[in-house]
Design a protein with these regions (language model features):
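Surface-exposed loop/turn motifs in large extracellular/passenger domains
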Residues: 1-192
């Protein structure tokens, strides 16, 4: 779906294939590009999706979540084909959330890096705001991350034209702006 407004429930889905862009496109997600004003509940996802060369707000599940509660559980990656990359606001699950809360649990991103591809960036931005789970959580409401494994490379190539290029990179969340509580438990981040 390109976008949703209101409540959405999606269960038991497999995402495969690839999407390629030439430094254009925004609000791009494996399931939803843009989600607004509701509760989005997406569960039991297996993916080997590859999104390459998009501009901004790119996620393996949803590109941009606004004014919502986003729930994602049982998200599994067990293939070296998985890759999410673009210019800015890049995340394995969500590129950007704004004025939203999230509950993300039971995530396994297991893209094992071999010696041969040790320099490959799997979840990356050419500019900024990139996270293993969410690229940017702005004005974040109370949220949680639990039972999360991110075993892959996350980074920025720092080749963007923005003066802040290469900033805001995180194993879980690239950038988070909130005065609310975010519970994080049982998480593991590794590049190997």
């Amino acid at each position: 779906a390109g976008s949703s407004s209101g409540n959405v429930t999606i269960d038991n889905i497999t995402i495969s294939g690839s999407m390629s862009f030439d430094k254009m496109g925004e609000n791009i997600g494996g399931i939803l590009g843009y989600a607004n004003n509701g509760v989005q509940k997406i569960t039991n996802i297996t993916t080997n999706l590859s999104i390459n060369g998009a501009n901004t707000k790119v996620g393996g599940v949803v590109g941009y979540v606004e004014n919502s509660t986003f729930e994602c559980s049982q998200f599994t990656v067990n293939t070296n084909q998985f890759a999410i990359n673009g210019n800015s606001y890049i995340g394995a699950i969500a590129g950007k959330t704004y004025n939203s809360g999230f509950s993300i649990s039971d995530v396994s991103i297991n893209h094992i890096m071999t010696e041969q591809d040790k320099d490959v960036l799997v979840i990356y931005a050419t500019n900024q705001f990139v996270g293993g789970i969410i690229g940017c959580a702005e004005q974040c409401k109370e949220s949680s991350l639990s039972n999360v494994l991110v075993r892959t490379s996350v980074g920025s190539s720092g080749t963007g034209s923005d003066s802040d290029t290469g900033k805001y990179v995180g194993g879980l969340i690239g950038y988070c702006n909130t005065s609310n509580k975010i519970d994080i438990c049982d998480t593991k981040i590794s590049s190997q």
